[in-house]
Regions:
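Short, well-structured N-terminal submotif of metal-dependent ribonuclease cores
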Residues: 1-36, 40, 46-64
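Generic structural signal for small/hydrophobic residues in well-ordered secondary structure
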Residues: 7-8, 44, 80, 111, ...
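Alpha-helix capping/helix-boundary segments
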Residues: 10-11, 40, 76, 107, ...
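Alpha-helical elements of the RecA-like P-loop NTPase motor core of helicases
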Residues: 13, 46, 78, 127-128
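A short acidic, often aromatic-flanked loop/helix-cap motif at beta-alpha or helix-coil junctions
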Residues: 42-43, 75-79, 142-145
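Short, hinge-like loop/turn segments at secondary-structure boundaries
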Residues: 51-55, 87-88, 136-139
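Active-site neighborhoods of divalent-metal-dependent phosphate/nucleic-acid chemistry enzymes
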Residues: 69-117, 121
Length: 145
């Protein structure tokens, strides 16, 4: 299997379930190289409770040391804007909905550029984004969705 990138939804589940959740992240990767997006890192820092800040800091340090952090390029940002414009007209999204999707679209464009598969629990939005600009994504193994 190719490289994987976990969406924020996957890390949040792992943080909420503690050590068992971290073990499940390793099982999800199953020998595949795992990458971290700077977009996901931002979302984690913005939403983490104080007791889990060190876990996020460790993620940042470990992925940076391994040189496996994806940072969106100028082209990723431009493609994100174009995809969100199409998304809005195809799915009748208002401005608030587009703002919520910006990070997901940015994650999709940057991972897609690198040929990295996104693992996410957010099936609805990622399936729609992939119809507008193809990229590889999957639900976590064992997900009911």
């Amino acid at each position: 299997m190719g490289a994987l990138l976990f969406d924020t939804s996957i890390y949040i589940t792992a943080l909420r379930t503690g050590a068992e959740g971290n073990l499940n992240l390793r099982q999800l990767a199953a020998g595949s190289p795992v990458w971290l997006s700077s977009v996901v890192l931002e979302e984690l820092y913005a939403g983490v409770n104080p007791r889990d800040t060190r876990v996020v800091e460790r993620l940042e340090r470990d992925f940076t040391k391994a040189k496996r952090v994806i940072v969106p390029s100028l082209n990723d940002w431009a493609l994100t804007g174009k995809v969100l414009a199409r998304f809005s007209s195809e799915y009748d999204y208002e401005e608030i909905g587009k703002a919520r999707l910006t990070n997901d679209a940015l994650l999709a464009m940057s991972a897609g550029r690198q040929g990295i598969t996104i693992v996410t629990a957010n099936q609805r939005d990622f399936a729609r984004l992939a119809k507008l600009r193809p990229f590889s994504w999957q639900l976590p193994t064992g997900s009911a969705d």
